[in-house]
């Protein structure tokens, strides 16, 4: 009798442990939280770099690489309605910090303005590392708020160190702002010499539902410093 009761207790404990284990696995597999969005200052910057010039990009050690983006058919997600057998994804997914872009062509900063893609439903990746120097000419950037400001024709999403800064329910400058609108993303509220940022800009031709006969290109790319 005691053996039977013991077996029942063990079985019940095992059943309780299963959802706990599943819950633990789910938590372990959850993606890390995105960094919160920070609104850029609205005052004039103490110093400004034009990253579409050789001099401006060189000041931050930028090396711009570019890649076309393909739309590929993939199986539908788990739990999709039965009529949906396939869906679409993009290749490559190049937002992560450790993405290998070594085979992508390097472009000159001025060629960020080149009109790329074949138009219509079209996307482009632009990637570059940025490193804060001890001095930019006579300007000392230490302690400054550093803001990356880009305007992509027509839309963009901006990845910083492997993430799109943002939080559900809050505005984020790293996400689509509007048609040909500047996106001013705070990289740090207090930079120091040697700080590194891996930037990945996902350029989008739009309006997407119109699929216009336009291309993807940078209208501007700047680094702003505020003190």
Regions found by a protein language model. Name each.
Residues 33-91, 104, 187-227:
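An acidic-aromatic loop/edge-strand motif
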Residues 121, 141, 178-180, 191-194:
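Surface-exposed coil/turn segments at beta-strand junctions on protein surfaces, enriched
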Residues 104, 122, 130, 135-162, ...:
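Aromatic-lined ligand-binding clefts that engage carbohydrates, nucleic acids, or primary amines
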Residues 160-184:
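Solvent-exposed beta-strand/loop surfaces of large extracellular or lumenal domains
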């Amino acid at each position: 009798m005691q053996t039977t009761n013991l077996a029942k207790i063990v079985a019940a404990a095992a059943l309780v442990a299963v959802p706990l284990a599943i819950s633990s696995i789910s938590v372990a597999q959850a993606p890390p939280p995105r960094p919160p969005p920070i609104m850029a200052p609205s005052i004039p910057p103490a110093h400004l770099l034009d990253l579409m010039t050789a001099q401006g990009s060189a000041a931050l050690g930028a090396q711009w690489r570019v890649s076309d983006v393909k739309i590929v058919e993939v199986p539908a997600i788990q739990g999709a309605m039965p009529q949906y057998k396939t869906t679409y994804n993009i290749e490559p997914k190049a937002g992560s910090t450790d993405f290998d872009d070594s085979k992508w062509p390097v472009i000159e900063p001025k060629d960020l303005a080149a009109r790329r893609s074949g138009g219509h439903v079209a996307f482009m990746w632009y990637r570059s590392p940025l490193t804060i120097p001890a001095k930019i000419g006579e300007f000392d950037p230490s302690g400054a708020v550093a803001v990356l400001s880009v305007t992509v024709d027509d839309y963009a999403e901006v990845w910083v160190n492997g993430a799109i800064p943002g939080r559900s329910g809050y505005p984020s400058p790293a996400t689509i702002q509007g048609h040909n609108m500047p996106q001013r993303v705070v990289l740090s509220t207090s930079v120091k010499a040697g700080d590194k940022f891996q930037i990945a800009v996902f350029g989008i031709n739009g309006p997407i539902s119109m699929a216009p006969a336009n291309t993807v290109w940078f209208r501007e790319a700047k680094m702003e410093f505020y003190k």
